[in-house]
Each structure stands twice: as C-alpha cells, then as structure tokens.
C-alpha cells in the first residue's frame, strides 16, 4: 500500500488518525481505539518515503532541519489531512489526522442551540477548549460555517496549519497559515486589525502575546473564536490569567470579564453501541454573575454558577453526561470515566 491507499483505507474505516511508525504496521484510530492494519511492518525507508511523498520542498527542509514538522494537505475526492511528521527511536514516524472535506453543520453535530447564538454575537470572545482530539476544530468550523451562511461580513482565520477549508458564502473568508502566509500568530493578529474583519478565528492561543492580541481584538468590537487545551471553563480562566505577570493580572481580569462571551469545554465519549463518538460539553456563558466572578478572582465559585444557569443555556460537563446516559447514548461507565465527580455515575 502507498500513502494514498493507506489514507483511503483510513477514511473508509472512519478513522480519525493514521499512524505511521518505522518498525511497525500502520495503525488507525477508530472511535478512540488504535488498531493495527493487517499488513507487514514498515521500515524506516518506507515511512520516510511515504512522508516525503506528501511534503513540499519547504516542509522537507524543515523536517530535516528541525526533525519534526506540521502541515496539512488535501487529496481530491477523499479528504484533507493534518500531519505531524517526526523521528523516534526506530526511525521516521507520522500521524495524519483526517479533516472531512465537508464541514458538518451544528445540526449534524447535535450541538446545543446556544452555539449558533454565540456564532452570531457581534463582538467578544468565544473559546472552545478540551484535550487534543476532542473535536474543538470540528465545533469551531461548524460555528464559523453557521456565521458564514447567516450573516454578511469578513471572517479571518489564523491557523497552524489550516484545517477545515471554508468557502466564502455570505461572508468573505480569508484563511492564513503560519509559515506560508504569515510569520506567526502574533504578526497575523496585529495585521488582522487593519484588515476589516468582523470575526477572527485564532487556531491556538498558545502564548501571552497571542492571548493579549486576541483579547484586544475582542475588546475593540470583533468576534474572536479561539482554542485552548484546558479541560474546564474555570481552568480556562485560570490559564489565561496565569500567563500574565502579577502586575497585569487585575487589568487582564477586567478585560476578560468585559469581552468573554463563552467558554465551551468539550470531550468525546464513545457511544453505547460502540459505533461512534459523541461530544459532551461544559458551557459557561458571560453572564453578569460570571463576569463579576472573573473580575473578583472568584474562579472557584464558577462551577455552582454554571450548575444553576441552565435557563440561559449553561451546563456542567456532568449535567450533560447525565443527560447522555438518560438518553441511552453513552453508558454510565463511559460517563464515569469523563466526569468531574465520578461518584455521580454508579454502576
């Protein structure tokens, strides 16, 4: 099998990822589980050749120089793929994540109605958080697509690398990739404010300057979508504030309390039938109570505010997990493994 055949096999089997690792057969991740493909192990030369086949000259140069590289590419009629190529103790390796060519709608994702409302906010910051592989990019792509189909405006994305490719519908969409199109997230965000955007998607808010620029954009009348690798709304607030030096924390709390529209923290759960995965969400909205808690550094009290905020669309992760168990979508055991308070899910 060549790389295209392996990727076609991966897509056909609804795999989220294809793993290539010298010394072992190729493997795919299906519904969260890694499974071996029933072919002979690949040696270093084979894996290296497969990786080189899908790289351009710049990516090859970066791989040789830095020993690892991130990029994305598309196979017409199949899908788009996000790639991390690296080296390990047996030789070359790569993980290729499937990015569907067709962006799923919020309805197809069974997303809460509030996600559509958030996508149409005129300004402020909407953060989607969760561990790697929790579907953050899929959720954000659906929200951006909803805005694109509903309103007239300019959406600018800054990604590393570009994942979902958006077609301009009602909105003009410009997508920029760190490397080929801009030197850094920071440079792109500074430039973005002079590019007349209505909404900005920041692929990853990974450092102080990126977070500062994203918050500034939200504060100056733009809708900013962003991601963090935090597992809850409270941890997200802590993470943002902890990045800044002590003398700035009070000002940052004030900025965040003014600009935050929502934090959506999600995780993927295996369905009861074992035929797929479903997202479970904690949803915290920028209500006046939440804004006050951010301003007053009372992050620990957020959980109870979220718990009692169902009338406005808020929910804790455990509340959503409980609902999924009641609807027979996931098992109590699966919920217990994901829950903040596992004792709530006996059995």
Could you tell me what each predicted segment is?
Residues 1-347:
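Short, flexible helix-loop junctions that flank or precede catalytic/ligand sites
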């Amino acid at each position: 099998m060549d790389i295209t055949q392996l990727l076609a096999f991966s897509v056909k089997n609804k795999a989220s990822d294809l793993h290539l690792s010298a010394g072992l057969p190729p493997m795919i991740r299906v519904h969260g589980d890694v499974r071996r493909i029933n072919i002979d192990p690949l040696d270093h030369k084979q894996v290296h050749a497969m990786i080189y086949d899908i790289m351009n000259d710049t990516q090859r140069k970066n791989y040789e120089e830095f020993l690892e590289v991130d990029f994305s590419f598309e196979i017409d009629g199949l899908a788009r793929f996000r790639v991390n190529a690296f080296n390990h103790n047996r030789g070359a390796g790569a993980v290729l994540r499937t990015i569907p060519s067709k962006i799923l709608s919020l309805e197809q994702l069974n997303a809460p109605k509030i996600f559509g409302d958030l996508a149409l906010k005129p300004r402020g910051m909407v953060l989607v958080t969760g561990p790697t592989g929790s579907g953050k990019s899929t959720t954000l792509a659906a929200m951006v697509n909803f805005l694109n189909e509903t309103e007239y405006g300019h959406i600018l994305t800054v990604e590393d690398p570009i994942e979902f490719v958006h077609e301009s519908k009602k909105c003009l969409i410009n997508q920029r990739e760190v490397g080929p199109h801009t030197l850094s997230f920071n440079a792109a965000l500074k430039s973005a404010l002079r590019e007349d955007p209505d909404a900005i998607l920041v692929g990853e808010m990974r450092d102080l300057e990126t977070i500062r620029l994203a918050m500034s954009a939200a504060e100056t009348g733009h809708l900013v979508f962003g991601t963090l690798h935090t597992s809850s709304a409270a941890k997200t607030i802590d993470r943002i504030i902890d990045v800044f030096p002590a003398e700035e924390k009070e000002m940052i709390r004030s900025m965040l309390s003014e600009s935050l529209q929502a934090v959506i923290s999600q995780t993927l759960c295996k369905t009861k039938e074992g035929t797929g995965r479903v997202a479970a969400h904690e949803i915290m909205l920028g209500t006046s109570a939440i804004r006050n808690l951010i301003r007053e550094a009372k992050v620990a009290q957020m959980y109870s505010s979220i718990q009692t905020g169902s009338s406005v669309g808020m929910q804790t992760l455990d509340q959503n997990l409980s609902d999924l168990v009641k609807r027979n979508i996931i098992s109590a055991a699966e919920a217990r493994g994901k829950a903040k308070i596992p004792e709530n899910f006996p059995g």
